[in-house]
Amino acid sequence: DMKVPNNGTIIGDDKNPGNMKDQAETGDYKNTSILSISLKDGERFYGGGSTSRDHIQHRGELLRMWTTYQHTEIPMPFMISSENWGIFNNTTRKNFFDIGNYQSDVFSIYNTTDEVDFYLMFGNSMPDVINYYTAITGRPYLLPKYAYGLCFGPNMLEDQFDILNDAVRFREMGVPCDLFWLEPQWMEKRYDFSTKKKWNYQKFSAEAYWDSTRYPKKENHRLLIGRLHGMGYHMGLWLCIEYDLSVPEEDALAKAMGKPLSGQEHWMDHLKNFVDNGVDGFKMDPARTIDEHPNFKYYNGHTDKEMHNLNQILLPKQMYKMMREHTGLRSWHHYTAGWSGTQHWSASTSGDNGGGRTALFDQLNLGMSGFLNTSCDVMNVNKDEELQSLHFGLFLPWVQINSWYSLHQPFYFPEK
C-alpha cells in the first residue's frame, strides 16, 4: 500500500504552499459534549466509514471522525450494533467514537462543541438500520450503466496517440473497457486549480487549437473524444479543486428567498465547456479540498471547524448538480474523500492507498456504512499481488485501473 509522502501534501501536488492543520485536536474542553451509552456483553459494532484500516468490527476502538488524507478519507459518524440499533452523530465538526476503548462497557461520542444532535435507529436487522441511516443522509448514487464496466486511467505521460492506440488494442484483445480518463497531463498548466484551464493542445486535440476561444463548445467527431466515442468508450478528466464551496450553496438559498446573489463565480460552471467538447465525467482528486484551511473564513461566515468535513459533501454534490442540469443525465464522477451524505452524490475510491489490504478494509467498512459505489486503485500493489488485486477489484461495485505513473495495460504483461 502507498504511504504518506514526506512533505505531508497530497501525492503529485508538489507546489502546495503548505498543508496547514488545526492544532486544537479536541477543542475547548469547556465547550464540548459527551454522549455515553451502556453496552451489552458480546455486543459488536460496525460502520464508521473509512476510519479503521485494521478491523471491520469496532468494539474496543477509538475512531477519529475527521477527513484526513491517506488516513481517514471518508469518516462517517455512524455506527451499527449487532443488537440491531444504530446511531448517527449529526455534525460536521471533528468528533470521536470511543466504542468500549476507555471503558469496555461504554460507548462514548465526544463532540468538539457543546451541542449534541443525533439520531437513534432501531430495526429488525442490521440492514434495516443501514436503510434508516441512508433515508436520513441520502440513498446511494446510481452511476450510469457504462460506469459499472471497466474504467481505465492510462499513464500520465501518454498523449492522444498513445491513448487511441490503447483503445484500439483493448478492442482487439477483447478487453471490456467502457471508459478512459486522462490524468493531469490534459491541462495546459499542470495542476490548474483555476476556472481558466485549457486543454494541453500539444498533447490532446479535443478541439482545434484555433477554436480555443470560440463558444459554445462542441464535440468534433474527427478528433480524440469523437474517435473514442466512435469505438464505444466514454471519456473522463482528472480535476483538482481549491475553492470556497459555500458560495454556490449560499447563492442557491438567496435565489430561493429572492435575495441578492454573491456575484462570485461558481467553480463548476467552467467545466461545462469541456462537457460540450464531449467529456462524460470527472475524477475529483483530493487536492486540495481534503487539505485543512484553519485560517480561512468562508463566504457563509464559518471556518474549517464546521466546513472541512462538510466540503467533502458539497464538492460531489455540486458536481452532480452541474452535470445533471447541463446534460440531463447521470454522470461518471467520483471523489476520494467524503462524509455522511457523500454517498448520495457520488462514487468513491480508497484514495492514494493502492489496491491491497487498506483498500479491502475501506470497501468493507464503507459498505457497512451505507456507501455503495466504492472502488480503489486496482493493481497498485506489489508485483506478486497484481493479479490478486485485479481479481479483487473486479468484484467491487465499480472497478477502475489507475496507471497514473505505472503501465497497467494488459499487453505489457507476460502471457503467463
Please place each PLM-identified region on the residue numbering.
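Aromatic- and carboxylate-enriched substrate-binding clefts and catalytic-loop regions
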Residues: 7, 12-14, 21-28, 176-416
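Catalytic and substrate-binding clefts that recognize carbohydrates or anionic sugar/phosphate headgroups
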Residues: 1-144, 153-156, 160, 167-172
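N-terminal small/glycine-rich loop or linker at the start of catalytic domains
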Residues: 136-153, 239, 245-256
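A residue-level signal for beta-strand positions that form part of recognition/binding surfaces
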Residues: 84, 147, 330
